[in-house]
């Protein structure tokens, strides 16, 4: 069994079996494979109940007793994923890694994701054992094989990692931290082109403790996390490798929790990844992975495996997971710390928001107006020209085109567009032609008119707009519909939900920084209303009003501090707790506010993903977000999308829409990631 560091607690899910007898196990396995068919239940029960060290003793005993190779017999008796999983457990960890890498670089094509996962996450000692195991098993040099199968900066970084020479000293020099921050900044953000060698040297050699401080200092100095700079400066497999290295430096268990989630979400399961991680981490940090998994995804690793796999394969994986966890929302101390750090990162980051649509250079409203008129005149419509012009002009420029169109032709451009294009494309193009506040006002009006109310649209708009945007929406609503937005919300919604929306619609959110004493008081109110405080005080109605006031009027920096204090006070995360304790539209509104405070681009990335997930597309939500965020933060949304869902927004749109609507959406998306 893998030994934890001195003084550290063992965090694996597989332990040495008490009263272990290798001869008895060898006999039981032989019996399980004898005759017609095999007793798979007995095989998985023995192998998942023994540590890797004990399994090696069973292999020896099996050979001594029967003159046969246990792994060869298991391969013969078992099939498919179950066989790969059991055989993986029977190999010593370094030989298991060696086999994975050999498979990744054999044959046509290379499994870069496998190479990245193994080489970015292993310790120096594990790396040395891997190199030796590869040499022993295949009589080949691992470094030479990797060089022969990869290229460029990706290859260089893999070779650096393969050396297993990362510094391991916990004593950190503040001067060297500052120097590395400066060197990374100058190698990327400040340089025309990127000095990849600096990234490779620093990220490939410095100690984990040192690099964590470098990342913290980099964020304070530049206002952006190191990951954002890597995405902006590097590309391809090299970018993916460097991001994996950074994730493993920050938290190796969190890296594997993400990999496991991505292996099981969506259609189909990436079984090779699932097997590799469950085998390799079972005696290292599976308990930490489980906690972080539950924290991030609000479901236990156990339940996701249970729903995503079947048969003996499922039973074996569940045994390796070590058990199920409590209901989502409650934390172990380690997981609470991870959530706290997420809020800390959110609080410190000065993220530069970037849209994908920018003002066109050499803008000529006269030429654009004429081109649009020509595209709509006569028989048929030239949709390509309409899409090309309107998606490549800023909203201010589009308003100038509208004015010029009217001056030249005495016609209303919006009316002409309505008569020439239809369906989803019309909604998108006409939305782009409206000033943002008038577009939002129209979306709110549509959400409230007719039978039923689109509460999700009301929440999405009112929970995410700035004070200035909200004030502009109020003016536009009054101008366009001769009624105040507040009156419209009052007549179309009710109860606590109505009060939340009206509070948000006033646009009176504070805009200052945090107040620590006030934040602790606010966190206490949140704990009491969510019924997890030790000492409730005050009546429920009064608490509900105070909680609403906190979420709807406190500044974003202050709320981030409130949510951190909430974790310290309760060992719970506020978002998970709201989801668990509340229901209906009130819950959805509060969750949207919390998510927007934490990471607004990620909030919109989630909404976009859900609009295209499963059968059918929610074109209204897709259009609304693509139009309203195109000049604000759509580039940031794109980055969050690919980070969370392992595919680009461009790919998702391409797979879910078609025709001219697809063309216009891709133009707004602004490129592939």
UniProtKB/Swiss-Prot annotation:
- Positions bearing Phosphotyrosine: 30, 201
In terms of Pfam families, this protein maps to: Annexin (PF00191)
- Provide the induction entry: By Epstein-Barr virus (EBV).
- GO biological process per UniProt: apoptotic signaling pathway; calcium ion transport; mitochondrial calcium ion homeostasis; monoatomic ion transmembrane transport; negative regulation of sequestering of calcium ion; regulation of muscle contraction
Q: What is its main location?
A: cytoplasm
Q: Which GO terms of the cellular component aspect does the record hold?
A: collagen-containing extracellular matrix; cytoplasm; extracellular exosome; focal adhesion; late endosome membrane; lysosomal membrane; melanosome; membrane
Annotated localization: Cytoplasm; Melanosome
Tell me the residues on which N6-acetyllysine occurs. Answer: 63, 68, 75, 81, 306, 370, 418, 483, 620
- Sequence positions bearing N-acetylalanine: 2
**Record-listed Phosphoserine modification sites:** 13, 422, 537
Task: Identify the keywords attached in UniProt to this record, alphabetized.
Answer: Acetylation, Annexin, Calcium, Calcium/phospholipid-binding, Cytoplasm, Phosphoprotein, Repeat
Residue stretches spanning the membrane = none
Which PROSITE patterns does the annotation name? ANNEXIN_1 (PS00223), ANNEXIN_2 (PS51897)
Return the similarity comment.
Answer: Belongs to the annexin family.
Its UniProt domain note says: A pair of annexin repeats may form one binding site for calcium and phospholipid.
Q: What does this protein do?
A: May associate with CD21. May regulate the release of Ca(2+) from intracellular stores.
Further details from the record: Seems to bind one calcium ion with high affinity.
Identify this protein by name: Annexin A6
Organism annotation = Homo sapiens
């Amino acid at each position: 069994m893998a030994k934890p560091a001195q003084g550290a607690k063992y965090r694996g899910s597989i332990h040495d079996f008490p009263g272990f007898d290798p001869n008895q196990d060898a006999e039981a396995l032989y019996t399980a494979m004898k005759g017609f068919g095999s007793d798979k239940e007995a095989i998985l029960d023995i192998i998942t109940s023994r540590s890797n060290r004990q399994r090696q003793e069973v292999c020896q005993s099996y050979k001594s007793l029967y003159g046969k190779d246990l792994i060869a017999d298991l391969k013969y008796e078992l099939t498919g994923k179950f066989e790969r999983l059991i055989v993986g457990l029977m190999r010593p960890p370094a030989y298991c890694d060696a086999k994975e890498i050999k498979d990744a670089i054999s044959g046509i094509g290379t499994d870069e994701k496998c190479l990245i996962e193994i080489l970015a996450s292993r310790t120096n000692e594990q790396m040395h054992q891997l190199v030796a195991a590869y040499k022993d098993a295949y009589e080949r040099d691992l470094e030479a094989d990797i060089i022969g199968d990869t290229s460029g900066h990706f290859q260089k970084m893999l070779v650096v990692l393969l050396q297993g020479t990362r510094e391991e000293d916990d004593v950190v020099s503040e001067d060297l931290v500052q120097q590395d921050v400066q060197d990374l900044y100058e190698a990327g953000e400040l340089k025309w082109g990127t000095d990849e060698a600096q990234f490779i040297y620093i990220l490939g050699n410095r100690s984990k403790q040192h690099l964590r401080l470098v990342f913290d200092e980099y964020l304070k100095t530049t206002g952006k996390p190191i990951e954002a700079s890597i995405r902006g400066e590097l590309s391809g497999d090299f970018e993916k490798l460097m991001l994996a290295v950074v994730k493993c430096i920050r938290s190796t268990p969190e890296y594997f929790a993400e990999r496991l989630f991505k292996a099981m979400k969506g259609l189909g399961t990436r079984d090779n990844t699932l097997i590799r991680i469950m085998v390799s981490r079972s005696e290292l940090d599976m308990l930490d992975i489980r906690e972080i998994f539950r924290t991030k995804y609000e479901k236990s690793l156990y339940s996701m495996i249970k729903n995503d796999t079947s048969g003996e394969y499922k039973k074996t994986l569940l045994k390796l997971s070590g058990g199920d966890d409590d209901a989502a929302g409650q934390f172990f101390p380690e997981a609470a710390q991870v959530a706290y750090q997420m809020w800390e990162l959110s609080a410190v980051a000065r993220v530069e928001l970037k849209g994908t649509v920018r003002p066109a250079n050499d803008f000529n409203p006269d030429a654009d107006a004429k081109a649009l008129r020509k595209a709509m005149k006569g028989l048929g419509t030239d949709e390509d020209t309409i899409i090309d012009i309107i998606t490549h002009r800023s909203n201010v420029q589009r308003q100038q085109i509208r004015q010029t169109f009217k001056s030249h032709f005495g016609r209303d451009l919006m009316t002409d567009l309505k008569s020439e294009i239809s369906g989803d494309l019309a909604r998108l193009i006409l939305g782009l032609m409206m000033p943002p506040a008038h577009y939002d006002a129209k979306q709110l009006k549509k959400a409230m008119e007719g039978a039923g109310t689109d509460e999700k649209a009301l929440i999405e708009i009112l929970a995410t707009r700035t004070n200035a945007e909200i004030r502009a929406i109020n003016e536009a609503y009054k101008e366009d519909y001769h009624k105040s937005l507040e009156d419209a919300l009052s007549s179309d919604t009710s109860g606590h939900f109505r009060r939340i929306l009206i509070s948000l619609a006033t646009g009176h959110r504070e805009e200052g920084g945090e107040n620590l004493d006030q934040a602790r008081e606010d966190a206490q109110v949140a704990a009491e209303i969510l019924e997890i405080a030790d000492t409730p005080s005050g009546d429920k109605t009064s608490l509900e009003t105070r909680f609403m006031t906190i979420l709807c009027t406190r500044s974003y920096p202050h709320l981030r501090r409130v949510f951190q204090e909430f974790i310290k006070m309760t060992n719970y995360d506020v978002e998970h707790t709201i989801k668990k304790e509340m229901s209906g539209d009130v819950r959805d509104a509060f969750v949207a506010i919390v998510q927007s405070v934490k990471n607004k681009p990620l909030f919109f990335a989630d909404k976009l993903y859900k609009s295209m997930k499963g059968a059918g597309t929610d074109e209204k939500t897709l259009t609304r977000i693509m139009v309203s965020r195109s000049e604000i933060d759509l580039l940031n949304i794109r980055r969050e999308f690919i980070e969370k869902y392992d595919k680009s927004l461009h790919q998702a749109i391409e797979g879910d829409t078609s025709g001219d609507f697809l063309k216009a959406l891709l133009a707004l998306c602004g490129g592939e990631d």
